[in-house]
Amino acid sequence: MFTLIVILAVSYLIGSIPTSIIAGRLLKGIDIRDFGSGNAGGTNAFRVLGWKAGLTVTILDIVKGAIAAISVVVFFESHPIGPLPDINPIALRLIAGLSAVFGHVFTVFAGFKGGKGVSTAAGMMFGIAPVTTLIVLGVFLLVVFLSRYVSVASILAAIAFPVIIAVRKYLFDLGEGLDYYIRMFNTNVFIHDSLDYHLLIFGFIVAAAIMYTHRANIRRLLSGKENRVKFHGHS
């Protein structure tokens, strides 16, 4: 139990690193939460600080989730400070990753007012199920391109993750669909993911959490006041 608590604490602290707030302080001497949408995330960094800073913040937030889901757990597996918890390995990585997402949303370093957790959740999922996450990324980019609403893309991508896991696990694994034909050609790139039922359950939990953190965006969408992204950007 002690090791699990330490893993959760370290993952939370990693997730709590307020990348967009740090970027705002360093680049413009501002608290990014006082501008744009008021959110301490990558999307608002794009709006307030420009595309270069926004992209950097987004990448770093993704890395936070991946580190928590992979590196933190692997470190304590190879450098034990006590017995590891008797938990399914995928579930343990998901719990660590979710702790990082929680840290991003409720960062201890900035008054527990952080971002929405989309990028950090994406990093967690990429570390565990890279192929599925890349498919979800395609969904995200397509929706952004067509609608120019990052919030809509984030919500739909979050919902798409568990749906894709379910389709691949319970449909393609029956010997039908793309997975079957890829196996016929002795290529396993499409089936590297850990299609574990824990992943499916946590996928739905994360989707619900993402929808909850986007509740203000949903209200603005319904009232026609949600901001659209501009592709030309600025530095």
Curated annotation (Swiss-Prot):
Pathway: Lipid metabolism; phospholipid metabolism. It is found in: Cell inner membrane. GO terms for biological process: phospholipid biosynthetic process. It is a multi-pass membrane protein. One of its GO terms (cellular component) is plasma membrane. Keywords: Cell inner membrane, Cell membrane, Lipid biosynthesis, Lipid metabolism, Membrane, Phospholipid biosynthesis, Phospholipid metabolism, Transferase, Transmembrane, Transmembrane helix. InterPro entries: G3P_acylTferase_PlsY. The chain crosses the membrane at residues 2-22, 56-76, 94-114, 126-146, 152-172, 190-210. It catalyses: an acyl phosphate + sn-glycerol 3-phosphate = a 1-acyl-sn-glycero-3-phosphate + phosphate. The keyword Cell division does not apply. Its main location: membrane. It is an enzyme of class 2 (transferase). Its EC number is 2.3.1.275. One of its GO terms (molecular function) is acyl-phosphate glycerol-3-phosphate acyltransferase activity. Catalyzes the transfer of an acyl group from acyl-phosphate (acyl-PO(4)) to glycerol-3-phosphate (G3P) to form lysophosphatidic acid (LPA). This enzyme utilizes acyl-phosphate as fatty acyl donor, but not acyl-CoA or acyl-ACP. Probably interacts with PlsX. Belongs to the PlsY family. This is Glycerol-3-phosphate acyltransferase. The lineage of its organism: Bacteria, Pseudomonadati, Chlorobiota, Chlorobiia, Chlorobiales. The gene is plsY.
